[in-house]
Amino acid sequence: KGCDFMEKYRVKPLKPAANMEISVPGSKSITNRALLMAALSDGRVCLKGVLFSDDSRYFLKALEELGFKLQIDEEKKEVTVTGEGGMIPEKSGEIYVGSAGTAARFLTAMLGLSGGTYTIQASEQMKKRPMKALFQALEQLGVHFDYLENEYFLPVRTLGKEAGKNRVTLDISQTSQPLSALLMASVMCNDGISIDITSEKKQGTYIEITRKMMQTFG
């Protein structure tokens, strides 16, 4: 099933006419969102048109380290993920996200809200990138962290989650990825999550992509 969340463009016919086949590359942002949603789904999900990049490979490796069953075919650009209904097979472990911002933020939200104990390592570049908005939001939701080097930066260890906290305020002025991360990972919370966006920026293309993809996944 397709996702109607991208802008539409008018394409003029090629003159003279020619018979050809064009392969359009996938999207890093869409690929990593789809991987997270597939992992949080219940049952097998086959993703087609996957973009294999450093970011998606770090994401795939992390899912394998967390115990998810994957079938990967780079030639066909396909990945099959067996979701565990919002559960993570391994209740503790360590992953490495390299310099992948989407993997870092999406997986941090998932691991934090799971209530397990996980260590999230990253490249020196990723250790300098802003994560404070996401960490503070997760702390409001009862997630406890051990910041291994600098507060509100990777690397970090999740130390479990308090029950009963489901309201959060969030500033997305720097990046909307924390909002996308919370929206997707909210399926792990029995009562859902109530998010109050405090920044002037409240909408954006990537937020809409996340919302439309979540609708597609049901």
Feature map (PLM): residue ranges:
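Structural preference for solvent-exposed beta-strand-turn elements
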Residues: 5-218
